[in-house]
Amino acid sequence: MISAIDALNNWEEAFSTDDAAPLQKMFTDDFVMIDSDGRRQSLDDVAGWATTEDFHIGDFDIIHDDDHCCCGTHSATLDGQDIGTVCFFALKSQGRISLWKIQRTPPSEE
């Protein structure tokens, strides 16, 4: 069973190497991602932007992680700029992730 920290590390590996393999190995064939705007994306959709955009994530805080689901928060940057904090929720199935839902909070303007 994949852990939340392993999943987040796989995301960062895909972002850092422009290689979708870490995502493909952790997501189910019927994987769905739902972004902050409610848009649903398939594995192919996610692999497209995850390997072409300059995203990075860090500051992982795992709130819950068991055999069925996980959730937590992480920081996110795009092109070196802070784009806020992301809250994620994932459903697990057959040892992999079948759903990844995010809600991003933009950085505060000071």
Language-model features and meaning:
Residues 5-7, 34-36, 40-110:
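A beta-strand edge to alpha-helix "cap/lid" segment located at domain peripheries
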Residues 1-21, 25, 29, 109:
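Short, low-complexity N-terminal intrinsically disordered segments enriched in polar/charged residues
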